[in-house]
Amino acid sequence: MNGTNRPTEPLSIAFYTSMLAFLTTIGVVGFLLFMAIWQYTTVGKVIIEILLSLIAFIGLFWNVYFSVSSIMKCFIPKKAFQTNTKYCSVIPENKPKHAEWMDVTIQIPVYKESLQEVLMPTLKSCMVARDHYVKNSGAKCNIVLCDDGMMVYLKNNFAAAEMMWETIEATKGKYFKLSQLLQKIPKPSRRHLKGLSSHAVYEVFHRMLYYYHYNIGFVARSTFDRRGKFKKASNCNSHLRLSWGAEQLSEADGISFEEALIENSHNSDGSRFIMFGGDVSIGELQLINDADARMSESVIIKTVPEFLNDKHLGFTQHATKTLDDQRRESYYINMLSSYTDALYMGHFLLSSILGCHPPLVGHSIILRSEAIKSCGRIRTLRKAQRWLNNIGLPFLSVDQIGSYNLQDNGSTEYWSECHVSEDFELMIHLYNLGFNGRYVNYPDCEFQEGITRTFDEEAGRHRKFALGAHELMFNSFNNWLGKGPFTPLFSTFLRSDIPSYYKIYLTSYMFGYTSGGCYILVFSIAAIARLCDVQQEIGFLSAFNSAGVLALSVIIYYVIGYTTFLFAMIKMKFSNNNLLFPEYRDHGVIYLCWRLIRYCMYFQILFYSVMGNYFFLGSMDHLMSRPNICGATNKDSIKITRCIAFCDMVRFNTGSWAIAFYLLVLAYLTVLKDADWKFDQWPNDMLGTFLFAGPAAFLALSAFYVPIILNPYILGWPFNPPLCGKKRQAEKKKNKGGKQVVDLGTFMAQTDSKLNKEIGRAENKPDVELGSLATNDFGRSNMTTATPFTNYHKTAPRKRPEGARPNQLTHAEKQRSRREANGNGASQRFTLAMI
């Protein structure tokens, strides 16, 4: 007996919404083509009109769908907000009586984020959720960090990593100072640290110490051969290949899982390519979390019954809001946090209730492990078939290729490493394989994520989204002749058994990133045709009206869009107030509407007036096979001056400003053309010229001032300057006596206080190269004290010149340090003082 009574079919509104939007778009494009033929004057004008009409389909598809779906969301019945629907869960389900709880693995890909500022708060929330699930279910739940920064710090020195981790395990993590730990290491083994930065060694030591104390597994791969445009996919794959490969090896050879892990982490020549520690096994479910994201205590135990009741459920996407610590950090954070809340609390939730499949955004998700394995086998099969086609062999079935070859974990891509939007690509694969997704918005079970702090970072993310959307749909230009315009993945998606209304929804959503750049292309064609029209044969173009496009966008997004969205949010508040985030739940309707209009709409007006340039750049990055220049989002706090922020802004917006300057030149040339190329006269048809060139000039000018307005590090005072990442020291609680209960929070507070103190001490030391460790190690033979440099500090201090700083070396000490460095590779005393 299942613990669910959700409907088996989505609401019928979704079908009517998609069909109406698609037919409306076809009707508008057909009308434009009819007008082009009906108003025939010259062959050139007809060709231009037809070309612009076909391009207009891409731009209109998302706009029409957005306006139609916004109106339809107002007709969602009240009952849908109070019960679970096919693709949305607002009430936790009950576990089936005879079903067993599933093992869960929390996987967190990290790089070089700050342990104290970013990783610790995230891991604390994960540990609380882990222990809550284990205590109440009896099942297994482990945390694994895919640490891509560890080997970067250690310069791919696996011997040093093994030495430090094995010593931490042997000493049971009781040494919080690196100098104390290194005393337990034999002198010949310390040579592995030679040439490493002292700060890098400190960072790795603190990470390993934290992982050990809180029973957190970690996987650190080699810095060589890290495939993928963005390393998150290959980082997660390294953990999946290691664990699942060890499981297969353990079953095949009859060895233990730990022995299989060690064998699977080494190359055939005995060299190591991946480091691991702790429990790195993978459960039946995987929770993917970002390095700067927090989760609620009960989110796992409330979500697992969803997978137990539906064997076709491949993933759940959870509602996510902005970090509480980051809210109100600056005026930009206020606007972006309101926009993020509206996205997850409004559009994603309403679309899922409406009947559309939820998106998979890459974090705050729970995935079924078997579904990920199926996607990996499909990718391997396609690679094998492409290889057979290249050498001229016919198509072979899975049985002929061999199931074992499809499970070669040394090269299987469970997450796509050749796509920028690996999460979106995985979602399409899951839908093609027959798995469903579900949007989960349990009350008080929201995830929290960090958001970007500047316009440049957010614009870079949207440029990456545009690149990923085009990568999924279209081949690059150099492959069009041989493979056609559409990718095999997108063609398979269109031919799959997925309901047609969802194909329309997903296609229109991806075309939304194309429509932003369509205006630049369409305006360029119309303006160049107008400039080359010497005989005045083209005249007015029915397929393109610059002012009409701008007015249509304003009407769709800010009149129809916000009117219907606010109506749907008000209806949801009165139907089920618990669906709103806590920041909006305790306030009235006026506060909800005012905050969404004040921050969210104002942000969209400014932000998306410039995003067309970045959508165009992202599409050209893929279509012209250009290397992507957008990096990962910075998760650490930013502390920079106004001058540095301005220079970074100029450097990032060079491409956008080039497009803006190009649009300004075209607009100005059309004005001169209408004025008979006379600089001191206005055009005869002033209104027509302004309606054609004015919107393009407005969008071009926006590209210059919006990046400055939306950057709080440039404006600063009086616009609520951002907090510059000041570290908050934990308050020491006084023990007032009584019975002391040692729980997880107390244990973490005690351990964190020691580790935080040691991290602060290490950060205040200068960064030096550990060069003397190969010969002199850390101490002499007569050193028996707790720290390896005690004898050095016990020597009588030399008399310093009057007025010298406390840490300033005298001339004689500098000479002696140079002599020791020349004789032993580096100054032993100087190196020991750094440690």
What feature does the model see in each segment?
Residues 190-194, 734-835:
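Intrinsically disordered, low-complexity cytosolic terminal tails
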